[in-house]
Amino acid sequence: MPPRDSGPDVTHADFDAEPAWTPPSWEQIVEEHSPRVYRLAYRLSGNRHDAEDLTQETFVRVFRSLSSYQPGTFEGWLHRITTNLFLDSARRKSRIRFEALGEDDGARLVTPSGRGTPERGFEHQNLDYDVQAALDALSPEYRAAVVLCDIEGLSYEEIAATLGIKMGTVRSRIHRARAQLRSALAHRAQSVEVG
């Protein structure tokens, strides 16, 4: 004899079913996740304007794809979208190389009053110029892997899923990126030893 239910219309599926996922509002998504998406976009792109564009593109993509989102790690999904958009952009720009401004050129960009914009102040307080310049010198694939690992704190498994590559490739890219970063930042270690 089957077990009795607590009511005539109740089935075991009713007890096992999870509540339906309700997508958050557009405002909730942007308010909660924009600082993290912008930080990732800035570290990947290396400048404020590209980071703003990448952040905007990410949220446009999220808005278009939210109905097909399968509940899981929302932050991981945002990382994947942001990183893939960055890599797509880097591939499109691969034929054109832009040279970074030298230290002497930067002095010409200071506002006449001698003060920078609020964004520039934030960057100077929170982002290290040498580290960002070293990140910018990496290939987009290496940069994405090392930023996701060392700055965003993702595991190798999460990076592999985000980038759609094998775990061995993740390890290799991170190892090579770190070696290039060590080489690019070697002058800092020497100045610490001297000082």
Q: Locations of the language-model features?
A:
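Residues within the DNA-recognition helix of helix-turn-helix
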Residues: H33, D130, R173-Q180
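C-terminal edge and immediately downstream basic/flexible tail or linker adjoining helix-turn-helix-like DNA-binding
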Residues: M1-D14, P24-S25, D104, E157, ...
